Amino acid sequence: TNLNCLGNVLTALDVSNSPSLEFLDCYGNNLTSLDVSNNTALTYLAVGYNQLDSLDVSSNTALTTLRCHFNQLTSLDVSANTSLTILDCYNNSLTSLDVSANTALTTLICHHNSLTSLDVSSNTALARLECNHNSLTSLDVSTNTALIWLSCFSNQLTSLDVSANTALRWLHCRYNQLTSLDVSTNTSLTYLNCEANQLTSLDVSSNTALGQLDCGNNQLTSLDVSSNTPLYQLVCGNNQLASLDVSSNTALTLLYCQTNQLTSLDVSNNTALSNLRCSNNQLTSLDVSSNTALTQLRFYSNQITEIDLSSNTAIGNLECGSNQLTSLDVSSNTALTSLACQNNQLTYLNMKNGLTEQVTDFNATNNSLTCIEILDPAWATSN
């Protein structure tokens, strides 16, 4: 027997006379309590997005799926639910969670709670674990060799050992206090986000399947991505990189390498690039003539004296302020909607692209402009 009453405005629901009920979905109502003690046949229970402050599932020993996220639960006892394979209890106020009896669990999503510890050593079938946005100081996943997806970001982890998790494809551990991270055995990784930790080095040479890498806001002095040829997103800003070689990463569409110590940047092989941010470095030149797919280009706060944008007709957002440009020609950039070229040495600015009225964000202050060429004098007067 199934009952689906999701997305209503129910404040009460009585299912006490339905002992044969197997499927109950009352997601997205205004329930403050729910009694399922008589529903011993339940295998699926979804009570997410209600206002429950307690939930007793001790009688529901047949449960395989329990979704109780976005409530006000302060505790949850699932010790009797040994058949559970999926448990979603995220966005509650749980301070502890005991899943030691739930050895069949394949998915555990408990993020956005107040957990200070989490023991998943008994959950050897676990393929997906999301425990981010808690207060965890440690996490042992050494027995979880089936893990494919691990999100443990925004905790207080000082170390993370994923050497046993060779099936891992997705690892998100940003906003912790990690000083090292060894991913050499995780050769199936396609996504790695270790941003905002305290990493001084990162070896991704074994991760040849990586498509997305975010290692920004660390203390990296070098980064070798030559083995990561499928990479299409690389975020490595706010580190201490003195050089960056992306010549092998021809699939790159997004590259954020701002706020480093780069003196040069060669993106001539990265013809698929649509978004490039390399601001706050020490670049004296930048060649983007091969990057015809660029829609966003930010290279402010460098030492660039000239830039040729004639090939970049798709650029919509251009930020080139605080350089040493003496002239700027955006006449070919007919998609331009935002231009920030302040704090340069501009004496000449060519905006004769025929579409000046579409530029909604324009800043050319603190220059020495004597001429701005446009096709629409009325626009110049009003802007």
Q: Residues of each region from the PLM?
A:
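Leucine-rich repeat
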Residues: 17-21, 38-42, 59-63, 80-84, ...
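Short linear segments in intrinsically disordered or otherwise low-structure-confidence regions
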Residues: 57, 75, 96-99, 120, ...
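Intrinsically disordered, low-complexity repeat tracts
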Residues: 1, 5, 11, 32-33, ...
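Low-complexity tandem-repeat tracts in intrinsically disordered regions
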Residues: 22, 53, 64, 72, ...
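Leucine-rich solenoid repeat scaffolds
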Residues: 347-383
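Conserved hydrophobic beta-strand positions in leucine-rich repeat
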Residues: 1-3, 22-26, 43-47, 64-68, ...
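Consensus "Asn ladder" position of solenoid repeat domains
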Residues: 8, 29, 50, 71, ...
